[in-house]
């Protein structure tokens, strides 16, 4: 019972097709149709531009519909969609949560989205990502994982979840990993 369609945007282009289920990283911001294989980066220095794109096979709403504990009302699911980011730093997991972003119709439709960890020239307004990097660095630093001059292999997994409707008690229903990527 919803005014939102079940159809999402599907696979948008060859880059999307080649990287379904992956998070890819870049040193500058790219639109979905501008990003190319040569745009991808594997290593970063903290403080330089760090951007990412999540490529999923279906929208977050479609990934969550039908899961135990999730409403069958597509609009309610779209309203409650949020993402977690699980970072594995040298094999040690740190769970973080993205702030909610996007309109309900976007959460229902989008199969790819972009984010930024560090944008040296922010002009795009609110873009997801910097909040999970801040949390990763703070928690990793306090756990003794990060030290000046140290190098780390970091894997990021993106996981959709559905929060309970406004005013309702309960924990979010957490879905499967929909995309994963590694960088150093």
In which residue ranges do the predicted regions lie?
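Contiguous beta-strand segments within globular domains
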Residues: 32-85
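Ordered hydrophobic segments in well-structured contexts
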Residues: 20-27, 49-56, 80-86, 153-159
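Extended low-complexity, serine/threonine- and proline-enriched intrinsically disordered segments
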Residues: 65-113, 155-160
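Internal, hydrophobic beta-strand segments that form the core of beta-sheet-rich folds
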Residues: 79-86, 127-183
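Extended, solvent-exposed segments with strong compositional bias
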Residues: 92-143
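Residue-level detector of beta-propeller blades
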Residues: 19, 93-95, 173, 177
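A eukaryote-biased signal for short, well-structured alpha-helical docking elements
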Residues: 2-28
């Amino acid at each position: 019972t919803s005014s939102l369609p079940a159809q999402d945007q599907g696979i948008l282009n060859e880059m999307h097709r080649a990287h379904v289920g992956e998070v890819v990283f870049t040193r500058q911001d790219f639109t979905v149709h501008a990003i190319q294989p040569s745009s991808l980066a594997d290593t970063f220095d903290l403080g330089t531009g760090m951007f990412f794109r999540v490529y999923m096979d279906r929208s977050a709403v479609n990934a969550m519909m039908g899961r135990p504990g999730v409403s069958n009302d597509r609009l309610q699911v779209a309203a409650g969609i949020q993402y977690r980011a699980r970072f594995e730093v040298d094999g040690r997991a740190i769970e973080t949560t993205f702030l909610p972003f996007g309109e309900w119709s976007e959460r229902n439709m989008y199969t790819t989205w972009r984010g930024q960890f560090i944008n040296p020239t922010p002009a795009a307004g609110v873009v997801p990502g910097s909040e999970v990097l801040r949390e990763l660095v703070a928690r990793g630093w306090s756990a003794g994982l990060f030290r000046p001059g140290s190098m780390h292999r970091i894997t990021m997994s993106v996981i959709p979840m559905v929060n309970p409707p406004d005013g309702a008690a309960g924990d979010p229903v957490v879905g499967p990993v929909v995309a994963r990527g590694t960088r150093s």
